Amino acid sequence: MGNEFRMCDDCQATNVKTLIPKLKKVDSCATIEVGCQSYCGPGRKKSFAFVNNRPVAAPTEDELIVKIEAKLNK
């Protein structure tokens, strides 16, 4: 089973337009779903994505990608 990335297009700290291409570079075969993730509190302050049903957050998008890559390489 492939990886799954989920993110919210309404949270203030997450820019879906720039994050999706970066996630595709991490794993081009992953499923990407966009919609409310009920993660509004942290989503106001940090860029986040759910990776295989686990939340990953960071102050910036670039830091988020580094954390996601580390999580997938475990």
From Swiss-Prot:
Q: Which Pfam families match?
A: DUF1450
By sequence similarity, the record places it as follows: Belongs to the UPF0741 family.
What is the protein's name according to its record? UPF0741 protein BCAH187_A5562
- Organism for this UniProt entry: Bacillus cereus (strain AH187)
